[in-house]
Amino acid sequence: MNRNKENEILETTLAIAEKNYPEAYRFLLNAYEESPSSLGPQTFYFLACLADGPGTALEWLRKAIQENNWWYRPEVLEDDDLAALKNDAAFLSLKAISDDRYAAAASKSTALFSWKKKMADNLFLAIHGNTQNGDVARADWEPIVGTSGLWQLETVQSAEPDGYGTYRWSYDNISYLPVANSMESLQNEGYHKIACGGFSAGCDMLLRAVTFSPAACDLLILQSPWIPVLQDHSEDVVRAISQKNIKLRILCGAEDVDCLPKAEQLYAVAKQAGCNVALTVQENTRHQFPAQPYHV
């Protein structure tokens, strides 16, 4: 499956669903019917949530869990959009199967750091968002980093499963540690420049790493930043960025109603603290990378 293509389709689906659930369902169903193999667990979940009745919703979940052997984080199957299935015996059976698979995956999952050795003068470390993985991060950032050979692109993948094939970050004192440890391990490898880029929750992990550990970099790029760390630690964050002389670049879609306020808040406090910071608001863009990539 092509997770990047799927993410774009699902973002469009969300935009339509804000005004019309049936229309959003038809759009996503058409996308699925055009290319079933390119869409995965999230598409089936969205189709179940948008379905016009519990029978159709249950069938999508049956296809995902029973036929495709996928699974979801337990909380996901407790969504209000699936409330009509809450006491359905067939649904509860599927959920039990999914929950068991999640528990098995979580018990053996570990963080993955792709770096093996120095292969270029500069290094770019990409951090995925929730319901993503290291491969998605690499595909998202490759057009931005480029293929000139000037930058070596590496990734960190969370240890916490989100669903089948995807991972998530928690906003606590533990989840960010693989990011911090990876950043620290690179600092004495002889790179001319080290840049880090995060998408959504990945931005929060980078800010926590810079703030609560010795980790540092030359450039920090935050795309569509979902950054709860600002709620209690905004002063600590900008102090760390300033003291470590990190260039901060914040980019967010003009239509990203959840993340744009936080992006603007971070820009304001960083600017006030004297940080080298810039904010780019990307027109006609929601919670996603822009159609036309920018460059490091």
Residue ranges and their predicted role:
Residues 3-30, 34:
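Alpha-helical segment of the N-proximal tetratricopeptide repeat
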Residues 43-51, 71-97:
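TPR/TPR-like alpha-solenoid helical repeat scaffolds
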Residues 108-121:
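Short beta-strand-to-loop junctions in surface cap/lid or active-site-entrance loops
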Residues 122-188:
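Serine-hydrolase catalytic machinery in alpha/beta-hydrolase-like enzymes
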Residues 196-198, 223:
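Short beta-strand immediately N-terminal to the catalytic nucleophile in serine-hydrolase-like folds
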Residues 198-206:
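Gly/Ala-rich beta-loop-alpha elbow adjacent to hydrolase catalytic centers
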Residues 215-228:
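A conserved short beta-strand
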Residues 227-296:
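The feature captures the conserved acid-bearing segment of alpha/beta-hydrolase catalytic domains
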